[in-house]
Amino acid sequence: MERSLELLLLLIRTLAIIHISQAQSQQGFISLDCGLPANEPSPYTEPRTGLQFSSDAAFIQSGKIGRIQANLEADFLKPSTTMRYFPDGKRNCYNLNVEKGRNHLIRARFVYGNYDGRDTGPKFDLYLGPNPWATIDLAKQVNGTRPEIMHIPTSNKLQVCLVKTGETTPLISVLEVRPMGSGTYLTKSGSLKLYYREYFSKSDSSLRYPDDIYDRQWTSFFDTEWTQINTTSDVGNSNDYKPPKVALTTAAIPTNASAPLTNEWSSVNPDEQYYVYAHFSEIQELQANETREFNMLLNGKLFFGPVVPPKLAISTILSVSPNTCEGGECNLQLIRTNRSTLPPLLNAYEVYKVIQFPQLETNETDVSAVKNIQATYELSRINWQSDPCVPQQFMWDGLNCSITDITTPPRITTLNLSSSGLTGTITAAIQNLTTLEKLDLSNNNLTGEVPEFLSNMKSLLVINLSGNDLNGTIPQSLQRKGLELLYQGNPRLISPGSTETKSGKSFPVTIVASVGSAAILIVVLVLVLFLRKKKPSAVEVVLPRPSRPTMNVPYANSPEPSIEMKKRKFTYSEVTKMTNNFGRVVGEGGFGVVCHGTVNGSEQVAVKLLSQSSTQGYKEFKAEVDLLLRVHHTNLVSLVGYCDEGDHLALIYEFVPNGDLRQHLSGKGGKPIVNWGTRLRIAAEAALGLEYLHIGCTPPMVHRDVKTTNILLDEHYKAKLADFGLSRSFPVGGESHVSTVIAGTPGYLDPEYYHTSRLSEKSDVYSFGIVLLEMITNQAVIDRNRRKSHITQWVGSELNGGDIAKIMDLKLNGDYDSRSAWRALELAMSCADPTSARRPTMSHVVIELKECLVSENSRRNMSRGMDTLSSPEVSMIFDAEMIPRAR
């Protein structure tokens, strides 16, 4: 009989859910059953929730499908019994359409279920766009795991990515997106990662849709020192947050009416920031002489009060600024006031942790353009997923991007689709890549005419159309100065300005170009023979770029030919003239002196002269020329040109007017002391330059002499890494180090490299850690007068005291965000770890520094607004139909 009654109640509840689900809209919901087999219905209605789930096949182009072990299926809802797993590729991404600027709940479910029979749950990273969201470790998660976040997308496209970090295979079971109410879950900065969402009831059941119209998932919780109260009356929930009515019909009060009602949670990192949302409703019938009134305290400090819960209606009290918990222990207390006759109550509450996503996504127009190109040519490259440019280690094959600074979206500067099997005409979507410098469409099957729009792309320096089947006449406008156009192997393409023969036929471009190329080759050979006769040289001669704008010559496969060809070779007399006979010396080193100069009468340059007495200097000179001819990044000092004439060797750089970072820490030479926020930005920009050398160059480079005097500052205090004389290339293959003669600056030198002569990119990371410590402390790297002479030893000893103020530069006068300071200090010590394997990569360093900068900027913005701040640090939101009582 009891069993029949249970089944009847279950049937009634199921019918009620279906009825409510039909009444409540799922508009904007994305509910993906990942790995749903093609032979199963899609969409389908999940019976317990009434939610409509669909196959994920239309939202991702990679992966294989699997199913948890059959004996485990009864423990999970249907969507969690299947999964999509990703044995191929480093990063695999879902592409979802969302509403730009609106807060969304994003939730993923991961259930291993021993689908592969190996009994080894995988570990991998979860990304939201270009930023890390969570690390998923299913080794001990029998019931799986379910990370959730509140996030405001900056575009109408959202990418959720699984990133392989080890030997195991990433997988996903369910992916859900829910648009939230306007103006809810807002932060000063960053997104909100769910920590707790609980309602207070002795029931074991959890709540979600349709009880919660936003499909937030609520777990029940009850403490042994509490007493439950409840009501059968209808409770209004019509404020912006709309917690489930079911959650509001129960509440907790302390059993000891005089005691506080306490909720506690622990923080792994004491610097973590939290937002708290507490939901109250008076569900008891109070007598005329009864009053319920209490204050809310967070970590012993008044959070809000007094609180008088509204009768059978909702009030939500929330923090509008982030909160931290000293020592990592968080404590929320509700304490009755002196005039209250009843203990405090709490119906439900939510706690979220702030997570920063500092990496800006690639320019939205560029992303749209390159995805249109991908769709037009039906390109199916495994790594063409999510953001095209960032993180840099996942940049799409065939692209190069510029990262001007940490507050500007990356832009696409190179598109290389050579030998990609392209067919059809040259798509007009290319013209929307408005910062494109290099376009390579060679060795495909493209047809039609060369489009006129290419001539309107003023940023283009190189266009390679070789090896296609293009026809018609090349637009005359593509002969503009500074543009290199290559079109060999298009027999039906007609060169601009070519004349018809007497028979009325145009000369094909290959003949014209061959004659021109032959003539140039003869001139070059004569010139080389003449120069050899005149004076033999042990240095390779680099010939200047031909001035003819349109030539049909074989395409060079250098990574950045447009950049390399722009470097100008100067004569010694030109160097003498530009420096006014070396009249203004602005620096000096072991290689020689650096003089100020001007090119073309206006462009300021720094001329680095090689001393004839410097034997090491000549090797460094050649290394620096070789490196700077093939690298280009906004945070690396640009090479304007060079001089290589007999015994006269010089490098001509852009002039960086604000000197080096060391001067702006010490105040030497009257330089202003930079504040903490500027230091963090400079550090992040220098880190971007190093990251480019490590993973953006082919082959990768190690700087080998990172120090504060080699970080220069331009007129806007943008950081530019300089002095590449000791730089070395790495093999592209499996080896991650090279053996070299020890070189570098004492104090900054990687101790592991010093003892083993094995150089790797982690050697730069160590040096950068020392630079960070200098920026934080303004202490000398080596000071023999200190008890701990090396800066890492001194900082390590001071860390034992736990007082950041004793470590920070006194010239900052305490004007810094302590959270960002601690985080930067921990990062610096991690970089300067004696063991290279324990040091982070520069990509990780960049992310950490960006997050530090976001924290510091948030503090500065808040402090600037304190004088005009009209709203309290806590906000109270009432039932929309209720007028709050006066106090």
Swiss-Prot record:
Its EC number is 2.7.11.1. Glycans are attached at residues 143, 230, 256, 289, 338, 363, 400, 416, 432, 445, 464, 471. Residues 1-23 form the signal peptide. Residues 532-887 are cytoplasmic. The keyword Signal applies. The modification Phosphotyrosine is found at residues 653, 753. It catalyses: L-seryl-[protein] + ATP = O-phospho-L-seryl-[protein] + ADP + H(+); L-threonyl-[protein] + ATP = O-phospho-L-threonyl-[protein] + ADP + H(+). ATP binds at residues 586-594, 608. It comes from the Eukaryota. Disulfide bonds: none annotated. The modification Phosphothreonine is found at residues 571, 740, 745. GO terms for molecular function: ATP binding; protein serine kinase activity; protein serine/threonine kinase activity. It is found in: Membrane. It is an enzyme of class 2 (transferase). Belongs to the protein kinase superfamily. Ser/Thr protein kinase family. This is Probable LRR receptor-like serine/threonine-protein kinase At5g59680. It comes from Arabidopsis thaliana (Mouse-ear cress).
